[in-house]
Amino acid sequence: MIGRLRGVLTSKTPPWLVVDVCGVGYELEVPMSTFCELPDVGYEVNLFTHYTQKDDSAALYGFLSESERRLFRHLQRVSGIGTKIALAVLSSVSVDTFAGLIQAGDVNALTVIPGIGKKTAERMLVELRDRAADFNNGISTSGKLNLDTVSEAALALQQLGYKPAEAARMARDAGTESDDVATVIKKALQAALC
């Protein structure tokens, strides 16, 4: 119905924003990964959208990339996963990282994401394994940051008091391909202090 919006960002309060398109203000809910990348109020934005309508409500969701929207749609096809968990996934890990977790069958790393327990993670693996290339644009995840390292570092950061989504983001953003867990944790903590 509404596939994309381009307009001026007029309001920005996590996780909501309003985009003015030719005098009409569209309210969208966005994952935190998208929210953090948005420009300041008053600047133009270009968002891919997903529209949902239930019995008594309608909602519009916004994403910076087509691959984020594609993953959001794939996640909602998994039994027991709705928009809330789909947004939590996109707020916690990148599309490439998520595809790598699915391809690797890493249940433990998936359970770090808020709202995903062991059973939900296992169901995601079963239902999404064959579709990982679809939402990942067929990009191979080899050569990327070691996913076991990311999940271990995220768990350690949680033990230090960080929320699961924040810990996952910190670990993912801080590490490089050759880093061990201790190095990822150290870099994540240094980045948090800056």
From Swiss-Prot:
A Pfam family assignment: RuvA_N
Region (Domain II) spans which residues?
65-140
Matching HAMAP family:
DNA_HJ_migration_RuvA
Under the subunit heading, UniProt states:
Homotetramer. Forms an RuvA(8)-RuvB(12)-Holliday junction (HJ) complex. HJ DNA is sandwiched between 2 RuvA tetramers; dsDNA enters through RuvA and exits via RuvB. An RuvB hexamer assembles on each DNA strand where it exits the tetramer. Each RuvB hexamer is contacted by two RuvA subunits (via domain III) on 2 adjacent RuvB subunits; this complex drives branch migration. In the full resolvosome a probable DNA-RuvA(4)-RuvB(12)-RuvC(2) complex forms which resolves the HJ.
Q: What is known of its domains?
A: Has three domains with a flexible linker between the domains II and III and assumes an 'L' shape. Domain III is highly mobile and contacts RuvB.
Where in this protein does the record put region Flexible linker?
140-144
What is the recorded name of this protein? Answer: Holliday junction branch migration complex subunit RuvA
Family per UniProt?
Belongs to the RuvA family.
The UniProt annotation puts the region (Domain III) at 145-194
> Which species does this protein come from?
Xylella fastidiosa (strain M12)
Location in or out of the cell = Cytoplasm
